[in-house]
Protein backbone atom coordinates (compact mmCIF):
# COMPACT_ATOMS: atom_id res chain seq x y z
CA UNK A 1 0.00 0.00 0.00
CA UNK A 2 1.38 3.43 -0.95
CA UNK A 3 1.87 6.08 1.71
CA UNK A 4 -0.72 8.26 -0.04
CA UNK A 5 -3.44 5.61 0.29
CA UNK A 6 -2.36 4.70 3.83
CA UNK A 7 -2.56 8.29 5.01
CA UNK A 8 -5.78 8.98 3.15
CA UNK A 9 -7.37 6.13 5.12
CA UNK A 10 -5.97 7.53 8.35
CA UNK A 11 -7.44 10.95 7.61
CA UNK A 12 -10.85 9.57 6.63
CA UNK A 13 -10.89 7.66 9.91
CA UNK A 14 -10.73 11.01 11.69
CA UNK A 15 -7.04 11.15 12.54
CA UNK A 16 -4.57 13.92 11.70
CA UNK A 17 -1.18 13.43 10.09
CA UNK A 18 2.04 14.25 11.89
CA UNK A 19 4.73 16.37 10.26
CA UNK A 20 6.84 13.23 9.81
CA UNK A 21 4.00 11.49 7.97
CA UNK A 22 3.54 14.48 5.66
CA UNK A 23 7.26 14.38 4.86
CA UNK A 24 6.83 10.76 3.76
CA UNK A 25 4.52 11.80 0.89
CA UNK A 26 6.58 14.78 -0.30
CA UNK A 27 8.15 12.88 -3.19
CA UNK A 28 5.02 11.02 -4.29
CA UNK A 29 3.71 11.51 -7.82
CA UNK A 30 2.03 14.93 -8.00
CA UNK A 31 -0.90 13.66 -10.05
CA UNK A 32 -1.64 10.96 -7.46
CA UNK A 33 -1.14 13.40 -4.60
CA UNK A 34 -3.56 15.94 -6.10
CA UNK A 35 -6.19 13.32 -6.95
CA UNK A 36 -6.08 11.87 -3.44
CA UNK A 37 -6.25 15.33 -1.87
CA UNK A 38 -9.38 15.92 -3.93
CA UNK A 39 -10.87 12.65 -2.69
CA UNK A 40 -10.21 13.73 0.90
CA UNK A 41 -11.87 17.08 0.19
CA UNK A 42 -14.92 15.43 -1.37
CA UNK A 43 -15.28 12.89 1.46
CA UNK A 44 -14.89 15.34 4.34
CA UNK A 45 -16.12 18.65 2.90
CA UNK A 46 -18.48 17.64 0.10
CA UNK A 47 -18.79 19.59 -3.13
CA UNK A 48 -19.87 22.94 -1.69
CA UNK A 49 -17.56 25.69 -2.96
CA UNK A 50 -17.03 28.90 -0.99
CA UNK A 51 -16.63 31.94 -3.22
CA UNK A 52 -15.59 35.31 -1.83
CA UNK A 53 -14.52 38.67 -3.14
CA UNK A 54 -12.61 41.59 -1.65
CA UNK A 55 -12.53 45.36 -1.98
CA UNK A 56 -9.52 47.53 -1.24
CA UNK A 57 -11.12 49.73 1.42
CA UNK A 58 -8.01 51.80 2.17
CA UNK A 59 -5.01 51.84 -0.12
CA UNK A 60 -1.29 52.47 0.31
CA UNK A 61 0.86 54.46 2.74
CA UNK A 62 1.41 51.42 4.94
CA UNK A 63 4.29 51.79 7.42
CA UNK A 64 4.98 48.04 7.51
CA UNK A 65 7.80 46.71 5.31
CA UNK A 66 6.40 43.41 3.96
CA UNK A 67 8.69 42.78 0.98
CA UNK A 68 5.98 41.46 -1.34
CA UNK A 69 3.50 44.30 -0.88
CA UNK A 70 2.76 47.15 -3.29
CA UNK A 71 1.07 49.14 -0.51
CA UNK A 72 4.15 49.56 1.68
CA UNK A 73 5.40 53.15 2.01
CA UNK A 74 8.92 51.72 2.16
CA UNK A 75 8.88 50.91 -1.57
CA UNK A 76 8.36 52.88 -4.76
CA UNK A 77 5.33 51.27 -6.41
CA UNK A 78 2.83 52.76 -8.78
CA UNK A 79 -0.43 52.40 -6.87
CA UNK A 80 -3.34 54.71 -6.12
CA UNK A 81 -3.44 55.82 -2.48
CA UNK A 82 -6.65 56.72 -0.65
CA UNK A 83 -8.26 56.69 2.80
CA UNK A 84 -11.33 54.66 3.84
CA UNK A 85 -13.83 54.32 0.99
CA UNK A 86 -17.23 55.87 1.54
CA UNK A 87 -20.04 53.66 2.77
CA UNK A 88 -22.09 53.71 -0.45
CA UNK A 89 -19.14 52.54 -2.53
CA UNK A 90 -18.56 49.55 -0.24
CA UNK A 91 -22.25 48.65 0.05
CA UNK A 92 -22.85 48.87 -3.70
CA UNK A 93 -19.85 46.62 -4.36
CA UNK A 94 -21.12 44.05 -1.86
CA UNK A 95 -24.62 44.02 -3.36
CA UNK A 96 -23.22 43.72 -6.89
CA UNK A 97 -21.08 40.74 -5.91
CA UNK A 98 -23.94 39.09 -4.03
CA UNK A 99 -26.11 39.37 -7.14
CA UNK A 100 -23.36 37.65 -9.14
CA UNK A 101 -23.47 34.64 -6.80
CA UNK A 102 -20.61 35.43 -4.41
CA UNK A 103 -21.02 34.13 -0.84
CA UNK A 104 -18.64 36.35 1.12
CA UNK A 105 -17.44 39.93 0.91
CA UNK A 106 -14.41 41.39 2.67
CA UNK A 107 -13.20 44.94 3.11
CA UNK A 108 -9.39 44.90 3.25
CA UNK A 109 -7.48 47.93 4.51
CA UNK A 110 -3.81 48.85 4.37
CA UNK A 111 -1.75 49.64 7.45
CA UNK A 112 -0.69 47.93 10.65
CA UNK A 113 -4.15 48.50 12.15
CA UNK A 114 -7.10 50.85 11.80
CA UNK A 115 -7.48 53.68 14.30
CA UNK A 116 -10.64 54.13 16.41
CA UNK A 117 -12.30 56.55 13.99
CA UNK A 118 -11.67 54.22 11.06
CA UNK A 119 -13.11 51.27 12.99
CA UNK A 120 -16.17 53.40 13.84
CA UNK A 121 -16.65 54.34 10.19
CA UNK A 122 -16.44 50.77 8.95
CA UNK A 123 -18.63 49.38 11.74
CA UNK A 124 -21.38 51.77 10.62
CA UNK A 125 -20.92 50.54 7.05
CA UNK A 126 -21.03 46.89 8.13
CA UNK A 127 -24.22 47.50 10.13
CA UNK A 128 -25.91 49.11 7.12
CA UNK A 129 -24.69 46.32 4.87
CA UNK A 130 -26.02 43.64 7.19
CA UNK A 131 -29.47 45.24 6.97
CA UNK A 132 -29.26 45.63 3.19
CA UNK A 133 -27.77 42.39 1.88
CA UNK A 134 -27.46 38.73 2.93
CA UNK A 135 -23.84 38.35 1.81
CA UNK A 136 -21.60 37.10 4.64
CA UNK A 137 -19.25 39.80 5.88
CA UNK A 138 -15.52 39.34 6.39
CA UNK A 139 -12.96 41.94 7.42
CA UNK A 140 -9.20 42.39 7.13
CA UNK A 141 -8.00 45.39 9.11
CA UNK A 142 -4.61 44.41 10.46
CA UNK A 143 -3.47 43.83 14.02
CA UNK A 144 -6.59 45.02 15.85
CA UNK A 145 -7.14 44.78 19.60
CA UNK A 146 -9.83 42.56 21.10
CA UNK A 147 -12.19 45.49 21.76
CA UNK A 148 -12.17 46.53 18.10
CA UNK A 149 -12.61 42.95 16.92
CA UNK A 150 -15.64 42.63 19.21
CA UNK A 151 -17.07 45.81 17.68
CA UNK A 152 -16.68 44.29 14.22
CA UNK A 153 -18.51 41.16 15.37
CA UNK A 154 -21.32 43.23 16.87
CA UNK A 155 -21.71 45.17 13.61
CA UNK A 156 -22.28 42.03 11.52
CA UNK A 157 -18.82 40.77 10.55
CA UNK A 158 -18.64 36.96 10.82
CA UNK A 159 -15.05 36.20 9.82
CA UNK A 160 -11.73 37.99 10.36
CA UNK A 161 -8.79 37.69 8.00
CA UNK A 162 -5.17 37.91 9.10
CA UNK A 163 -2.57 35.95 7.15
CA UNK A 164 0.43 34.36 8.81
CA UNK A 165 2.02 34.76 5.33
CA UNK A 166 4.68 32.07 5.83
CA UNK A 167 6.42 30.03 8.53
CA UNK A 168 7.64 31.55 11.77
CA UNK A 169 11.22 30.74 10.71
CA UNK A 170 10.97 32.52 7.34
CA UNK A 171 8.81 35.46 8.45
CA UNK A 172 11.69 37.75 9.47
CA UNK A 173 13.06 37.47 5.93
CA UNK A 174 9.95 39.18 4.54
CA UNK A 175 8.92 41.56 7.34
CA UNK A 176 10.65 43.17 10.32
CA UNK A 177 8.19 45.89 11.39
CA UNK A 178 5.89 43.49 13.24
CA UNK A 179 6.26 40.01 14.67
CA UNK A 180 4.77 36.61 13.95
CA UNK A 181 3.38 36.56 17.47
CA UNK A 182 1.52 39.83 16.76
CA UNK A 183 -0.42 37.97 14.08
CA UNK A 184 -1.11 34.98 16.31
CA UNK A 185 -2.31 37.26 19.11
CA UNK A 186 -4.70 38.99 16.69
CA UNK A 187 -6.08 35.65 15.49
CA UNK A 188 -6.63 34.47 19.07
CA UNK A 189 -8.34 37.75 19.98
CA UNK A 190 -10.60 37.49 16.93
CA UNK A 191 -11.61 33.97 17.98
CA UNK A 192 -12.24 35.23 21.51
CA UNK A 193 -14.50 37.93 20.02
CA UNK A 194 -16.58 35.20 18.36
CA UNK A 195 -15.25 35.59 14.83
CA UNK A 196 -14.32 32.80 12.46
CA UNK A 197 -10.76 32.98 11.15
CA UNK A 198 -9.43 33.20 7.60
CA UNK A 199 -5.64 32.90 7.66
CA UNK A 200 -3.13 31.55 5.19
CA UNK A 201 -0.21 32.97 3.31
CA UNK A 202 1.75 33.56 0.16
CA UNK A 203 3.79 30.90 -1.59
CA UNK A 204 6.71 31.77 -3.84
CA UNK A 205 8.39 34.28 -1.53
CA UNK A 206 11.61 32.27 -1.57
CA UNK A 207 10.51 29.94 1.21
CA UNK A 208 10.96 26.16 1.16
CA UNK A 209 8.28 23.49 1.12
CA UNK A 210 9.21 22.87 4.76
CA UNK A 211 8.25 26.48 5.51
CA UNK A 212 4.85 25.98 3.87
CA UNK A 213 4.27 22.79 5.82
CA UNK A 214 5.27 24.52 9.06
CA UNK A 215 2.77 27.30 8.34
CA UNK A 216 0.01 24.77 7.64
CA UNK A 217 0.64 23.04 10.96
CA UNK A 218 0.56 26.39 12.79
CA UNK A 219 -2.78 27.15 11.12
CA UNK A 220 -4.06 23.76 12.24
CA UNK A 221 -3.04 24.52 15.82
CA UNK A 222 -4.98 27.80 15.59
CA UNK A 223 -8.13 25.97 14.36
CA UNK A 224 -8.78 28.36 11.48
CA UNK A 225 -11.83 27.88 9.26
CA UNK A 226 -10.41 29.17 5.97
CA UNK A 227 -6.89 29.05 4.53
CA UNK A 228 -6.26 31.36 1.56
CA UNK A 229 -3.24 30.38 -0.52
CA UNK A 230 -1.82 33.26 -2.57
CA UNK A 231 0.76 32.77 -5.30
CA UNK A 232 3.31 35.58 -5.37
CA UNK A 233 2.74 37.90 -8.31
CA UNK A 234 5.97 39.95 -8.15
CA UNK A 235 5.24 43.69 -8.05
CA UNK A 236 7.63 46.16 -9.66
CA UNK A 237 9.26 48.38 -7.05
CA UNK A 238 9.12 45.83 -4.24
CA UNK A 239 12.20 43.89 -3.07
CA UNK A 240 10.65 40.74 -4.56
CA UNK A 241 10.02 42.19 -8.02
CA UNK A 242 12.50 39.74 -9.60
CA UNK A 243 11.47 36.71 -7.56
CA UNK A 244 11.11 33.61 -9.73
CA UNK A 245 7.48 32.55 -10.15
CA UNK A 246 6.62 29.10 -8.83
CA UNK A 247 5.98 26.29 -11.29
CA UNK A 248 2.38 25.11 -11.56
CA UNK A 249 3.49 21.68 -10.31
CA UNK A 250 4.87 23.26 -7.13
CA UNK A 251 1.61 25.16 -6.60
CA UNK A 252 -0.51 22.02 -7.03
CA UNK A 253 1.77 20.03 -4.74
CA UNK A 254 1.49 22.69 -2.03
CA UNK A 255 -2.30 22.82 -2.23
CA UNK A 256 -2.58 19.03 -2.11
CA UNK A 257 -0.30 18.80 0.93
CA UNK A 258 -2.35 21.48 2.67
CA UNK A 259 -5.44 19.29 2.23
CA UNK A 260 -3.62 16.34 3.80
CA UNK A 261 -2.62 18.55 6.77
CA UNK A 262 -5.90 20.49 7.01
CA UNK A 263 -8.51 17.94 5.92
CA UNK A 264 -11.71 19.79 6.88
CA UNK A 265 -10.98 23.50 6.35
CA UNK A 266 -11.83 25.69 3.37
CA UNK A 267 -8.63 25.81 1.33
CA UNK A 268 -9.03 28.93 -0.76
CA UNK A 269 -7.17 29.68 -3.99
CA UNK A 270 -6.48 33.39 -3.65
CA UNK A 271 -4.25 35.97 -5.35
CA UNK A 272 -1.91 35.18 -8.22
CA UNK A 273 -4.23 33.03 -10.31
CA UNK A 274 -3.76 35.17 -13.40
CA UNK A 275 -0.09 34.17 -13.63
CA UNK A 276 -0.88 30.46 -14.00
CA UNK A 277 -1.93 28.88 -17.26
CA UNK A 278 -5.57 27.88 -16.73
CA UNK A 279 -6.81 30.42 -14.15
CA UNK A 280 -6.38 27.73 -11.51
CA UNK A 281 -8.51 24.92 -12.97
CA UNK A 282 -6.03 22.15 -12.13
CA UNK A 283 -5.42 23.73 -8.74
CA UNK A 284 -9.15 23.50 -7.99
CA UNK A 285 -8.87 19.75 -8.55
CA UNK A 286 -6.11 19.41 -5.94
CA UNK A 287 -8.08 19.60 -2.72
CA UNK A 288 -9.27 23.21 -2.96
CA UNK A 289 -12.87 24.16 -2.08
CA UNK A 290 -12.82 27.95 -2.06
CA UNK A 291 -11.51 30.91 -4.04
CA UNK A 292 -11.28 34.67 -4.11
CA UNK A 293 -12.97 35.88 -7.29
CA UNK A 294 -12.66 39.23 -9.03
CA UNK A 295 -9.80 41.71 -8.66
CA UNK A 296 -7.30 41.56 -5.80
CA UNK A 297 -6.01 44.57 -3.83
CA UNK A 298 -3.56 45.98 -6.38
CA UNK A 299 -3.66 43.34 -9.15
CA UNK A 300 -6.29 42.03 -11.54
CA UNK A 301 -8.18 38.81 -10.83
CA UNK A 302 -10.62 36.51 -12.62
CA UNK A 303 -14.10 37.69 -13.67
CA UNK A 304 -16.70 36.17 -11.31
CA UNK A 305 -19.00 34.82 -14.04
CA UNK A 306 -16.02 33.05 -15.61
CA UNK A 307 -15.07 31.61 -12.22
CA UNK A 308 -18.55 30.32 -11.45
CA UNK A 309 -18.80 28.63 -14.84
CA UNK A 310 -15.44 26.88 -14.33
CA UNK A 311 -16.26 25.87 -10.75
CA UNK A 312 -19.62 24.37 -11.74
CA UNK A 313 -18.04 22.51 -14.66
CA UNK A 314 -15.71 20.86 -12.13
CA UNK A 315 -18.73 19.46 -10.28
CA UNK A 316 -18.85 21.89 -7.38
CA UNK A 317 -21.99 23.48 -5.95
CA UNK A 318 -21.73 27.27 -5.83
Swiss-Prot record:
Report residues binding [2Fe-2S] cluster.
106, 138, 198, 268
Q: Does the keyword Translocase apply?
A: no
The record ties this protein, via NCBIfam families, to: bioB
Q: Which HAMAP family match?
A: BioB
Molecular function via GO? 2 iron, 2 sulfur cluster binding; 4 iron, 4 sulfur cluster binding; biotin synthase activity; iron ion binding
Q: What does this protein do?
A: Catalyzes the conversion of dethiobiotin (DTB) to biotin by the insertion of a sulfur atom into dethiobiotin via a radical-based mechanism.
What UniProt keywords apply to this chain's record, in alphabetical order? Answer: 2Fe-2S, 4Fe-4S, Biotin biosynthesis, Iron, Iron-sulfur, Metal-binding, S-adenosyl-L-methionine, Transferase
Q: Could you read off the lineage of the organism from its UniProt record?
A: Bacteria, Bacillati, Bacillota, Clostridia, Eubacteriales
Tell me which EC number(s) this protein carries.
2.8.1.6
Its annotated pathway reads:
Cofactor biosynthesis; biotin biosynthesis; biotin from 7,8-diaminononanoate: step 2/2
Keyword S-adenosyl-L-methionine belongs to the record: yes
PANTHER family, sorted: BIOTIN SYNTHASE, BIOTIN SYNTHASE, MITOCHONDRIAL
Necessary cofactors = [4Fe-4S] cluster; [2Fe-2S] cluster
- InterPro entries assigned: Aldolase_TIM, BATS_dom, Biotin_synth/BioAB, Biotin_synthase, Elp3/MiaA/NifB-like_rSAM, rSAM
Task: Give the record's cofactor note, including how many are bound.
Answer: Binds 1 [4Fe-4S] cluster. The cluster is coordinated with 3 cysteines and an exchangeable S-adenosyl-L-methionine.
Name by which UniProt lists this protein? Biotin synthase
* Domain of life according to the entry: Bacteria
Q: Which GO terms describe its biological process?
A: biotin biosynthetic process
User: Where would I find the Radical SAM core domain in this sequence?
Assistant: 44-273
Instruction: Name the catalysed reactions.
Output: (4R,5S)-dethiobiotin + (sulfur carrier)-SH + 2 reduced [2Fe-2S]-[ferredoxin] + 2 S-adenosyl-L-methionine = (sulfur carrier)-H + biotin + 2 5'-deoxyadenosine + 2 L-methionine + 2 oxidized [2Fe-2S]-[ferredoxin]
Similarity comment:
Belongs to the radical SAM superfamily. Biotin synthase family.
Self-association and partners:
Homodimer.
| Entry binding sites for [4Fe-4S] cluster | 62, 66, 69
Amino acid sequence: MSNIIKYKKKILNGDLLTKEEVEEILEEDITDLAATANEIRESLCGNKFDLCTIINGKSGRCQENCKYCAQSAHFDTDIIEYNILNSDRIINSAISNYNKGVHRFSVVTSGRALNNNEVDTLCKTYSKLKETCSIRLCASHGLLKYEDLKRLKDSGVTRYHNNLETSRKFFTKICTTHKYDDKIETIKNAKKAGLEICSGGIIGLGETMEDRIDMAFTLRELSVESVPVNILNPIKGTPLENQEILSYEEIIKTLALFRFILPTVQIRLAGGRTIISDNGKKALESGVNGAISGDMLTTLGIETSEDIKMIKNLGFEV
